[in-house]
Curated annotation (Swiss-Prot):
Protein species of origin: Psychrobacter arcticus (strain DSM 17307 / VKM B-2377 / 273-4)
Claim: Nucleotide-binding is one of the keywords in the record: yes
SMART domains in the record: AAA
Assigned keywords, A-Z: ATP-binding, Cell inner membrane, Cell membrane, Membrane, Nucleotide-binding, Phosphate transport, Translocase, Transport
Protein name: Phosphate import ATP-binding protein PstB
C-alpha cells in the first residue's frame, strides 16, 4: 500500500450514548481513491464525517481515538477546525450550490482562508472549474446563479467549490446517487482524474461504482470495519465471508 495520508487508530464514535463506530483501525493511502461500502446505517458516512470533524456542529456527538493527518491528530482539542476543513474538502449526496452566482460559489471558501486580488481570484475560479470539468460549460455565464445549472453541473460546481481551497483530501459522500447515468459517468471520470492531485475517500451504495473508481475498498457493517484491501482483491477474493456475502448479494 502507498504511504498513508490519513491513519485511523482505535477510533470510536458516539451519537449520544450510541456507539456508531467501533475501534476502527485503517490507513487511507495518499493520492488514491478509497471507497467505503456497506448497508445503510453501517457507519460509512459517519466515518467520512470524522475526517473533517463535521460532527463538531452537534454537541451530543463525539469521537475517541486518533485520526492522524500528515502526523497531526485532527481529533486533538487544539486543532484549528476551520483550517482542517480547508485541507479536507467535502461534497455531499445531493448537489448543494449556494444561492449565489457560479463565480461566487467557487470563490466562497477561498475568501474565508485567503486574501486574493481580483485577478488572482479570477484565476483560482477558472482553475477550480477546469479541475471539475465545468469551465467550458459555464465560462460565459459565471454571473448566473449556481441554481440555474442542471443537477450534474451543480454537483461538479460543488466539486469545484471543494477543490478551490486547494485541499489535500476530498471526501465524497454518495456524490452521484441523485444524478442520472450520464452525469454519474462524468463524475466518475472526474474522480479518476482528481486522484492525481488529491487523496479521495468516497462513500457509495453502488458497488459497481466502487469497483470502477476506487483503488481500495473498505466494507463496514454495524459500525465495524470488516475488511479493507485493494479493490480487485475485495471484489474477487475477499478474506471475510461477510464481505463476500454482501458483494454477491447474499447479505440479509
Amino acid at each position: 500500500m502507498p504511504p498513508a495520508k490519513i491513519s485511523i487508530r482505535d477510533l470510536n464514535f458516539y451519537y449520544g450514548d450510541f456507539k456508531a463506530l467501533k475501534n476502527i483501525n485503517i490507513d487511507i493511502p495518499e493520492k488514491k481513491v478509497t471507497a467505503f461500502i456497506g448497508p445503510s446505517g453501517c457507519g460509512k458516512s459517519t466515518l467520512l464525517r470524522t475526517f473533517n470533524r463535521m460532527y463538531d456542529l452537534y454537541p451530543s456527538m463525539h469521537a475517541e481515538g486518533q485520526i492522524i493527518l500528515d502526523g497531526s491528530n485532527i481529533l486533538a482539542k487544539d486543532m484549528d477546525v476551520n483550517l482542517l476543513r480547508a485541507r479536507v474538502g467535502m461534497v455531499f449526496q445531493k448537489p448543494t450550490p449556494f444561492p449565489m452566482s457560479i463565480y461566487d460559489n467557487v470563490a466562497f471558501g477561498v475568501r474565508l482562508y485567503e486574501k486574493l486580488s481580483k485577478a488572482e481570484m479570477d484565476n483560482r475560479v477558472e482553475w477550480a472549474l477546469k479541475k471539475a470539468a465545468l469551465w467550458l460549460e459555464v465560462k460565459d455565464k459565471l454571473r448566473a446563479s449556481g441554481l440555474s445549472l442542471s443537477g450534474g453541473q451543480q454537483q461538479r460546481l460543488c466539486i469545484a467549490r471543494g477543490v478551490a481551497t486547494k485541499p489535500e483530501v476530498l471526501l465524497l459522500d454518495e456524490p452521484t446517487s441523485a444524478l442520472d447515468p450520464i452525469s454519474t459517468g462524468a463524475i466518475e471520470e472526474l474522480i479518476t482524474d482528481l486522484k492525481n492531485d488529491y487523496t479521495i475517500a468516497i462513500v457509495t451504495h453502488n458497488m459497481q461504482q466502487a469497483a470502477r473508481v476506487s483503488d481500495y475498498t473498505a466494507y463496514m457493517y454495524l459500525g465495524d470495519m470488516v475488511e479493507m484491501g485493494e479493490t480487485d482483491q475485495i471484489f474477487t477474493n475477499p478474506a471475510q465471508k461477510a464481505t463476500e456475502d454482501y458483494i454477491t448479494g447474499r447479505y440479509g
